[in-house]
Amino acid sequence: MRIILDAMGGDNAPEAPVLGAIQAAKDFGTQITLVGRGEEILNVLRTHNIEDLPAGMEIANADEVVDMHDDPARVIQKKKNSSMVVGLKMLADGAGDAFISAGSTGALLTGATLIVKRVKGIRRAAMG
């Protein structure tokens, strides 16, 4: 399983997603791509004395962040280099099997519908 993770989404980002992803990669051997501000992700590693990412992990740089106050309908147009939009585009392009974000739910559903698209025969996006 190849997971693309929005490292900048959520209240405790990027620390919580980055540390959680590292633990998952170590425990389960999951391939994970952290998407976000590369320097901030590296700062989390330095702060916790982590010299190298586990095997199968990589960082994909995205300079912008979707804020909880951003208009979900406009995020796709206005923040094309956000961690959420870049991650969804990676998923749509086949770079991963799943995309995870603790960021704006509205922006995630809108982005998933517009970028990744729905499965044929499915009319509404699902959350789980």
Located regions from the model:
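Contiguous, glycine/small-aliphatic-enriched amphipathic segments in soluble metabolic enzymes
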Residues: M1-L114
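Short, acidic/small-residue loops that bind anionic groups at enzyme active sites
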Residues: T110-G128
